[in-house]
Design a protein with these regions (language model features):
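Short catalytic/ligand-binding loop motif for oxyanion handling, primarily in non-cytosolic enzymes
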Residues: 22-24, 31-35, 62-64, 75-78, ...
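Acidic, Mg2+-coordinating phosphoryl-transfer loop and its flanking beta/alpha structural elements
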Residues: 69-104
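Conserved Lys-Pro-Asp/Glu-containing loop-to-beta segment of HAD-superfamily phosphomonoesterases
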Residues: 51-80
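Substrate-recognition element of Asp-dependent hydrolases with the DxDx(T/V) motif
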Residues: 3-5, 9-38, 42
Length: 112
C-alpha cells in the first residue's frame, strides 16, 4: 500500500531532527503484519531517521518525551509531556489539546 506523506512533513521533520532528538513512534504492533510495510515507508520518506529512532509499541503511554504529535486523542491523554493533536477528519470534534493543523504549524511552534 502506497500511503502518501503529508505535505511539508519531510521538510519539517528534517528540520526538527537538526534541533531535537526526534523519535517516530507507531502503535503498529496492534497490526503486526504492517510492521515491515511501515518500516519500508519510513525508510522511503524519512531516510534521515535511523532505525534507532523508530519505536514500534503496543501503546504510546510508555513514551517519555517533551512533545508528542499524534492524530489520536487516546495517545495524548496519558502523555506526560506537551501533547499536540494533529488535525485529521476523525478528530475535528476534540478540543482537549493544543492543535496543529499541518506541518508548517508544527514548524512555527517548535522551530521559530
Amino acid at each position: 500500500e502506497n500511503i502518501p506523506v503529508n505535505e511539508d512533513a519531510v521538510e519539517v521533520v528534517k528540520k526538527l531532527t537538526e534541533r531535537y532528538e526526534v523519535f517516530i513512534v507507531s502503535a503498529a504492533t496492534e497490526f503486526p503484519n504492517s510492521l515491515k510495510e511501515k518500516l519500508v515507508w519510513m525508510e522511503t520518506y524519512f531516510p534521515f531517521i535511523t532505525w534507532k529512532h523508530i519505536v514500534f509499541c503496543g501503546h504510546k503511554h510508555m513514551i517519555q518525551a517533551d512533545y508528542l504529535i499524534d492524530d489520536h486523542e487516546k495517545n495524548l491523554h496519558t502523555f506526560t509531556g506537551t501533547p499536540l493533536l494533529f488535525t485529521a477528519p476523525h478528530n475535528l470534534h476534540i478540543t482537549d489539546f493544543a492543535r496543529v493543523n499541518n506541518w508548517k504549524e508544527v514548524e512555527k511552534l517548535l522551530l521559530d
